[in-house]
């Protein structure tokens, strides 16, 4: 990497839905800093995460591999140490891979002693990163900062949710379980603390160009916001929920939907149970989710202002995205473990460095992009080679203002929902452990979801964008559904793990086909 190469700032929020940006017309959420970033760069409207939840999704983002290849299928499933990753690749290119926050990596236990504390958490750091502070979900560094400021902390050893709940003020009558504000002001909260650390880094980097991955916890739970954010939006003004109708009608869509509804709406939200019939509480929960986004955006505005002050703003590749989405009570679900778009459709904003892309700035890219495209985009900007293992493709043509000669016409994603400890899906819906999974393919017209031991799901998105009617059993759609099943199978076959498959040992030594010869992104 030469000194005139750009800096790289990769920002990830956690659990941020694609529709929650004012730049795409959300009626309530205000994201002024991100709107400016989008106006100066490109907003990718059809960007999708590959797996969910956090650990598998970040494994795909940071290794550029589909779930079927990296196989870190759930929070706590080890990520094979043999795979290349973004941190190691940018370090090999001569950059210091700095992390502020977390990567939710479960380490490869084959390379650790049996008593290594790293084997007790899924929140280790991806190998190759130099972590400045841990993520605020672990709260240790932020807790020390609060203590220095004179706050009384909860007892040692308390869990992350309980740590946050310690700072919730008394319930406000009629406000719902997530309305009561934090007892600390906004400038002392975990998001501000993380961004303060990032600002300090960009003001005083050890060398240039630099690489910084800033990983923010919000708007992920706990659903707790300080004043004035806790009352910024009226719960009565939030958009209506996307549902089939009542809970029974929603559950009838598919056995997986019914199972997830049982497990992921009755979940505990800090100290209060969210009862499905408590509409006011659900509205307040959604408003609180929006508060946390506004809070993140305001703090990102401070970070971008600091970059401008240092003179580095124009020489920095800035990427904003997230790990996965959030159902937020649509389809009577909470969290990110459905097959609906709300769990997988996520934001991606990229601001290229310099002024060479003025002609494309402010453009909305409608092509289907995936989380696995982020790593090759960064490596290309750094002048580094993209490893053969990678399933995604650099977005450089889009950023340069040209259309790629070939590009995918659909997005795919996967999820594994087995539970090693409880075995809940095995007991409740009779699914063997290794069959608790699904794969989905979605284009502008249809979505097909395949389960190895449950019926498929199929939606006509043109007629039913809210995914309210599963057409899998409708004989009139059998032919088109089969075509999408074949399309999904073709995509999976084309992307089978191939780190070594393009190499052949010969009497004259190894020969290798370049990655660009191996797979065109237009292949499905």
Say what each PLM segment does:
Residues 449-451:
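Short beta-strand micro-motifs enriched in acidic
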Residues 462:
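Residues forming the ATP-binding cleft of Hanks-type serine/threonine protein kinase domains
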Residues 497-515:
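Short, charged, surface-exposed hinge/linker loops at domain edges
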Residues 1-446, 456, 466-486, 515-524:
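Formylglycine-dependent sulfatase
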Residues 478-503:
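A contiguous, mid-protein "functional segment" used to position or interact
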């Amino acid at each position: 990497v030469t000194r005139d190469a750009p800096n790289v700032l990769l920002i990830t929020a956690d659990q941020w839905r694609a529709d929650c940006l004012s730049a795409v017309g959300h009626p309530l959420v205000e994201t002024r800093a991100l709107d400016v970033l989008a106006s100066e760069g490109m907003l990718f409207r059809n960007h999708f995460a590959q797996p969910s939840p956090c650990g598998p999704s970040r494994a795909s983002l940071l290794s550029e591999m589909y779930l079927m290849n990296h196989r870190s299928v759930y929070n706590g499933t080890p990520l094979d140490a043999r795979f290349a990753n973004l941190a190691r690749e940018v370090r090999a290119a001569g950059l210091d891979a700095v992390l502020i926050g977390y990567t939710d990596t479960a380490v490869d236990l084959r390379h650790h002693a049996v008593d290594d504390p790293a084997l007790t958490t899924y929140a280790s750091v991806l190998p190759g990163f130099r972590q400045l502070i841990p993520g605020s979900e672990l709260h240790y560094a932020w807790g020390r900062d609060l203590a220095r400021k004179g706050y009384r902390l909860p007892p040692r050893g308390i869990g992350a949710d309980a740590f946050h709940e310690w700072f919730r003020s008394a319930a406000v009558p009629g406000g719902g379980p997530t309305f009561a504000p934090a007892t600390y002001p906004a400038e002392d909260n975990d998001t501000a603390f993380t961004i303060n650390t990032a600002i300090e880094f960009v003001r005083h980097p050890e060398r240039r160009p630099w690489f910084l991955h800033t990983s923010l916890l919000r708007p992920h739970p706990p659903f707790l916001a300080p004043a004035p954010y806790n009352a910024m939006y009226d719960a009565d003004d939030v958009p209506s929920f996307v549902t089939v109708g009542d809970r029974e009608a929603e559950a009838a869509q598919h056995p997986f939907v019914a199972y997830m509804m049982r497990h992921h709406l009755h979940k505990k939200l800090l100290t209060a149970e969210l009862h499905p019939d408590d509409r006011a509480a659900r509205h307040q929960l959604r408003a609180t989710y929006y508060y946390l986004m506004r809070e993140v955006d305001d703090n990102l505005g401070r970070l971008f202002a600091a970059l401008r002050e240092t003179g580095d703003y124009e020489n920095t590749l800035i990427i904003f995205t997230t790990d996965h989405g959030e159902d937020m009570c649509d389809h009577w679900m909470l969290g990110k473990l459905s097959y609906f778009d709300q769990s997988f459709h996520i934001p991606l904003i990229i601001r290229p460095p310099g002024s060479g892309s003025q002609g494309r700035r402010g453009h909305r890219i409608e092509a289907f992009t995936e989380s696995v495209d982020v790593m090759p985009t960064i490596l290309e900007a750094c002048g580094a080679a993209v490893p053969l293992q990678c399933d995604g493709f650099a977005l450089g043509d889009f950023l340069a203002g040209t259309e790629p000669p070939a590009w995918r016409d659909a997005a795919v994603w996967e999820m594994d929902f087995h539970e090693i400890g409880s075995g809940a899906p095995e007991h409740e819906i009779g699914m063997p452990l290794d069959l608790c999974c699904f794969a989905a393919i979605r284009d502008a017209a249809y979505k097909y979801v395949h389960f190895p031991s449950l019926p498929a799901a199929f939606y006509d998105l043109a007629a039913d964008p809210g995914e309210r009617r599963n057409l899998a059993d409708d004989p009139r759609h059998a032919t088109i559904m089969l075509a999408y099943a074949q399309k999904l199978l073709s995509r999976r076959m084309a992307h089978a793990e191939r780190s070594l498959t393009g190499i052949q040992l010969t009497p004259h030594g190894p020969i290798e086909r370049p990655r660009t010869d191996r797979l065109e992104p237009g292949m499905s």
